[in-house]
C-alpha cells in the first residue's frame, strides 16, 4: 500500500469521510555545500523519493485535528482561536503546531482542518524528515485554503517554526529544497538571496545514500561551536558572513587568525567555491570533476572542520575504491556520524552495496549500514 493509500484509508476510518486532497513533501540529501548555509553561502541539494504525505480535509469550525499514522495514530487537537503552545507530550505535534502558528503570524486566512500524516523519510539520518513534515503541513493548508504563499514563503515558514517554536537552530536549505525540488535536478541555492538554479543530473546516475548507523553524538553542541567559530572569523574580516570573504584575501592573512578558527573558515570559504564549481560540473555531466570536488569536500570536513568520525571516513574510502573517478562520495549532513552521499553510474550500485556490506562492519564496531538508492525528485505538491 502506498503512503497516499495509507493516509486516505486512515482518514476514512478516523473521520468517517473522504479526504479532500493528499499532498506530499520530500526529504533531501545535500550533494555538496556542507555547513555553508548559515554562513550565507551556497548549497547543492536534491529532493529525494522519500517523503511526508498528508491526506487532509476542511472542517467547518476552527479546530485543527491531526493524526500521526507513524505513531500508532496518536491524535492532537488544537484551536486556531486560542494561543498555540507546545504539546505537553508529543514532540511530533510541535512541528505541526509551529507551522500553523507561524502561518497565522503571516496573516494567512484559513480555517479548521483534519490531517492524517505519514512518512517514510528515515528519521535521525540527516535526510530532513522534520523539514519535510513542516513543508507538508504548510502545503496542506495552502492547498486546502488557496493561500497566496509561494514555495519560498512556505519554506521560510517551516524554518521559522523549527527555529522559534520547536527550538532547533537550522538553516533554510532543508525546507527550501523540500518546497522547490525539481525532478531529475539538483538545486543550487544561494542561502543569502534564496535564489535558486535547477541543475540537471546526468542520466543513468544513481543517488546513493548510505547510513553509517553511527549515532550522531555531540552534533548539537559541536554545531553551535562551529557556528560561533565561523561568526568569529567573519568579525575578524569585518564582513557579515564568511560568504563575503574572497579566497585570495583569506589565504593572504589566515595566519593572523586563531589557528582553529582559521581552519573552520578555510572549510567554509573553500566549500563555497567547490559548490559553485560542482553545479557547473554536474550540469556538464563531468562526473570525474564532480568526484574530485566531493573528495575535496570530505577531506576539508575531516581535516579543517573536523566533523567526521573514523567509521565514516572508512565508509567513504570503501565506496571510492569501487567507483573510482566515475562518481563521487562524501559525508553529508551535520557530522559525527549519519550518512554519506555517493553519485555513481547505475551499473555500479550493486557492486558498491556488496563491497560495503563485506568491508564496513569491521570498521564500525559491527554496525551494519543502511543503503538507500534514490532519485532526484519533485518538491512539495499534490500527491
From Swiss-Prot:
Domain of life: Bacteria
Pathway where it operates: Carbohydrate metabolism; galactose metabolism
An annotated Gene Ontology molecular function: ATP binding
Catalytic activity: alpha-D-galactose + ATP = alpha-D-galactose 1-phosphate + ADP + H(+)
Transport listed as a keyword: no
Residue positions binding ATP: 124-130
GO biological process: galactose metabolic process
UniProt keywords, alphabetically: ATP-binding, Carbohydrate metabolism, Cytoplasm, Galactose metabolism, Kinase, Magnesium, Metal-binding, Nucleotide-binding, Transferase
Classification via Pfam families: GalKase_gal_bdg (PF10509), GHMP_kinases_C (PF08544), GHMP_kinases_N (PF00288)
Heme listed as a keyword: no
Primary site of residence: cytoplasm
Localisation per UniProt entry: Cytoplasm
Residues of the active site: 174
Binding site for substrate: 34-37, 223
GO cellular component terms attached to this protein's record: cytosol
Site annotation Transition state stabilizer: residues: 28
Binding site for Mg(2+): 130, 162
EC number: 2.7.1.6
Enzyme class: transferase
Family: Belongs to the GHMP kinase family. GalK subfamily.
Task performed by this protein: Catalyzes the transfer of the gamma-phosphate of ATP to D-galactose to form alpha-D-galactose-1-phosphate (Gal-1-P).
Official protein name in the record: Galactokinase
